[in-house]
């Protein structure tokens, strides 16, 4: 699918200017291992869409901060506008991860 077809499909399916698009595999996974071609990130950049990153936080501790920071840095300034921590184990786990990620600027 070319750029014009992608833009046309996006316009058709986001009539209210809001859309939720689920990527395949990971945010940067596409046709090539060394660039964004065919990835969800390529589409987001093409359409100038913000990314809300959903992260599986099960069995995660402070290291999740480094993982999220890597995504934010790879995406570039302003591309990722928020993070949802999914599959939290408990309220204590949520509190712990919020503290671990508190210094992150998104």
Predicted feature locations:
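GTPase G-domain guanine-specificity segment
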Residues: 85-106
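ATP-dependent carboxylate-amine ligase catalytic core
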Residues: 1-47, 55-82, 91-95
């Amino acid at each position: 699918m070319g750029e014009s077809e992608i833009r046309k499909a996006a316009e058709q399916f986001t009539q209210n200017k809001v859309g939720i698009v689920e990527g395949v595999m990971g945010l940067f996974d596409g046709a090539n291992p060394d660039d964004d071609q065919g990835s969800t990130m390529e589409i987001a950049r093409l359409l100038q869409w913000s990314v809300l990153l959903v992260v599986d936080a099960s069995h995660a501790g402070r290291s999740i901060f480094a993982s999220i920071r890597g995504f934010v840095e790879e995406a570039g300034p302003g591309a990722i506008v928020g993070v949802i921590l999914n599959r939290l184990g408990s309220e204590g786990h949520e509190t712990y991860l919020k503290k671990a990620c508190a210094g992150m600027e998104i």
